[in-house]
Amino acid sequence: MQLTNFTDFGLRALIYLGSLPEGELTSITVVTETFDVSRNHMVKIINKLGQEGYVKTIRGKNGGICLGKPADQIIIGDVIRAIEPLQVVNCAPEFCHITPACRLKGALAKAKQAFLDELDKHTIQDMLTDNSELLILLKRI
């Protein structure tokens, strides 16, 4: 299953925010530059993650962004469910005339569930714990 760029960069942003010392704020600009993505795209991603409670945004002169909850409470499968469309194929009868007899939809649904079940075992903290190489890369970029 391939994730959209929106979800890919959303997960990267959460990992980056999780790598910061607790309570430290950063800016969308810093996250944008870290991952070489357009600012407009990252603003949309951060807004969605904020709506879902994964990112806290603080406005004003001393404002910025940080994780909205502890990294060990942000389950990757939940993040994907919240921001990814997750429609593997379009099985509406008006788009596919074999839908009434097709078994592919069921197989794909099981595969999608297995994908999410695996990601439900991992948190943002899991991506950071004992991963000094990642932390070095995030600081160096």
UniProtKB/Swiss-Prot annotation:
Top-level taxon: Bacteria
Cofactor note: Binds 1 [2Fe-2S] cluster per subunit.
Keyword Transferase listed: no
One term of GO molecular function: 2 iron, 2 sulfur cluster binding
Residues given in the record as [2Fe-2S] cluster binding sites: C91, C96, C102
Pfam families recorded: Rrf2
HTH rrf2-type domain sequence ranges: 2-129
Role, per record: Nitric oxide-sensitive repressor of genes involved in protecting the cell against nitrosative stress. May require iron for activity.
Protein name, UniProt field: HTH-type transcriptional repressor NsrR
Lineage: Bacteria, Pseudomonadati, Pseudomonadota, Gammaproteobacteria, Vibrionales
